[in-house]
């Protein structure tokens, strides 16, 4: 019984629950990055690109910074904590879906980076034609 009471002590306040959500999100991000790099290196059909790795890490770091910066803005408001839990849950589900995509448990055919690259190529091509 002492052990259960000790474990419940960690979930008494909302701040500790937020820390656990952030920790879970960070673990999911690390697992997703490691699996992505590992499978890209081991699979000869996938082109290993340092640009994609840097972009992925940059996206994860920016998501974590935004998740941390949202805490001081959300806590003072009554609807802030449920909204923050919703955002953290959505980020965790997104990371878990990405992990499942690496493990080929879900069919994820979208290549967001390719869409962005094509968009920037088209916009930069228009700017060159106008000059």
UniProtKB/Swiss-Prot annotation:
Topology in the lipid bilayer: Multi-pass membrane protein
Regions that span the bilayer: 53-75, 79-101
GO biological-process terms attached to the record: viral release from host cell by cytolysis
Entries under InterPro entries matching the protein: Phage_holin_4_1
Localization, UniProt: Host cell inner membrane
Pfam annotation, one family: Phage_holin_4_1
Keyword DNA repair tagged: no
Cellular-component GO terms for this entry: host cell plasma membrane; membrane
Domain of life: Viruses
Stretches in topological domain Cytoplasmic: 1-52, 102-131
Domain notes: Isoform Holin has 3 transmembrane regions whereas isoform Antiholin lacks the first transmembrane region. The C-terminus acts as a cytoplasmic regulatory region.
Name of the protein: Antiholin
Species the sequence originates in: Bacillus phage phi29 (Bacteriophage phi-29)
Gene behind the chain: 14
């Amino acid at each position: 019984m002492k052990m259960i009471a000790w474990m419940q002590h960690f979930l008494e306040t909302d701040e500790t629950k937020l820390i656990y959500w952030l920790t879970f999100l960070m673990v999911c991000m690390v697992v997703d990055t490691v699996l992505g790099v590992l499978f890209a290196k081991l699979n000869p059909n996938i082109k290993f690109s340092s640009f994609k790795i840097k972009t992925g890490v940059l996206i994860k770091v920016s998501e974590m910074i935004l998740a941390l910066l949202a805490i001081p803005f959300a806590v003072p408001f009554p609807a802030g904590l449920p909204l923050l839990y919703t955002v953290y849950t959505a980020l965790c589900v997104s990371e878990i879906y990405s992990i499942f995509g690496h493990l080929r448990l879900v069919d994820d055919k979208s290549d967001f980076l390719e869409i962005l690259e094509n968009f920037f190529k088209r916009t930069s091509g228009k700017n060159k034609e106008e000059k």
